Regions:
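Anion-binding alpha/beta catalytic cores of soluble intermediary-metabolism enzymes, centered on
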Residues: 1-148
Length: 148
């Protein structure tokens, strides 16, 4: 690929069928990363009103906590911030970060990932003038009030 593309839209596919042929196939996000020799990728679901980006891709839920790191959060939010500016023409992106744990961890009472990885990453990103929230509770993040 010659870096001429600005976006790629993929459709649903049966991972089960593809994995029966290629045992190393995880998902098209990882496949596209491999064939484009990209350093990192960001999976995003987008509509006219909302864009949702994922910190991880196709991994079992039990592996998510050990996959989350300060560096991962920083890299993903930097990619998201730049894409919102350059590909969605949003001059000042307002990025909300969802917590990994219920109620965004309740200050370490329900999981430590927010305290150990996510909040330090956000503090570093804010120093770089990226408009990003502290972790918010995922169970209310998509309510009408929260989306205003």
């Amino acid at each position: 690929m010659q870096n001429e593309e600005t976006a790629l839209v993929t459709g649903p596919l049966s991972k089960e069928n593809i994995i029966s042929i290629d045992k190393l196939f995880i998902g098209h996000t990882e496949y596209i990363k491999k064939i484009t020799k990209s350093k990192d990728v960001l999976m995003m679901l987008a509509s006219d009103q909302l864009r949702v980006a994922l910190a991880t891709t196709h991994i079992p839920l039990k592996n998510v906590p050990r996959t989350i790191s300060k560096e991962l959060i920083i890299n993903k939010i930097k990619i998201l911030n730049e894409d919102l500016k350059n590909k969605f023409n949003i001059k000042k992106p307002n990025i909300k970060v969802l917590g990994l744990n219920p109620h965004a961890g309740e200050n370490g009472k329900i999981g430590k990932e927010e305290q150990v990885y996510i909040k330090p990453a956000i503090k570093e990103l804010r120093k770089k003038k990226i408009n990003v929230s502290m972790p918010i509770s995922a169970d209310t993040a998509f309510s009408r009030k929260s989306l205003k």
